[in-house]
Amino acid sequence: DEMYDSWSELLTELYVLNPELNIVFTVSPVRHAKDGLINNNQSKSRLFVLIERLKENFPLSYFPSYEIVVDALRDYRFYKKDMIHPNEQAVDFVWSHFVKTYYTETNMDLIKRISKLKSAKNHQIMNPDEIEGEKLKKWIFEERNKLNEEIGGNFNL
């Protein structure tokens, strides 16, 4: 099958580059109504079968965002007015399940630090020459450098 062969080739290359890679697949809960609901369901069914086949041969996981929205949040109050896209409440619900499933405490701490750093960077300093403004700029610089050392990259806001 063409889809399987393409994905298999890509995943093989990725795992050669990084054997510790954690790959998560999901199927979008958004309906592609413009293709017709029958075609949408057939397409998603093919994706489910593909992912199951890939899981048999590669160390990857599946996150059930489709199932959460379609089954757990099956009420249309969880959709936007177009009745196709999940609303903010549904997205938050799915995201909270994703975080509980895949994030470690270390990940969560890192996300909090990055959010705090982004907020500080976006803060409007009334008078940048004042001592408080200088302290904030210094803290942003130092915190960004600490993050770069910890994550081994070039973290830039």
Residue ranges and their predicted role:
Residues E2-V24, E56-P59:
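Secondary-structure boundary elements
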Residues M3, W7, L47, V91:
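Aromatic/hydrophobic pocket-lining residues that form the small-molecule binding cavity
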Residues L11-Y15, P19, R31, E52-K55, ...:
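Hydrophobic/aromatic-lined pockets within catalytic cores
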Residues T12-N41, I114-K121:
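Active-site segments of SGNH/GDSL-like serine hydrolases
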Residues N22-V24, S45-D75, H97, I111-R113:
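Extracellular serine-dependent O-acyl
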Residues D35-E56, Y79-K80, I84:
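Non-catalytic scaffold segments within catalytic domains of secreted glycoside hydrolases
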Residues F58, K81-D82, D92, S96-L157:
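Conserved catalytic region of serine esterases and O-acyltransferases that act on ester linkages
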Residues Y66, Q89-D92:
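N-terminal targeting/trafficking signals and adjacent low-complexity tails
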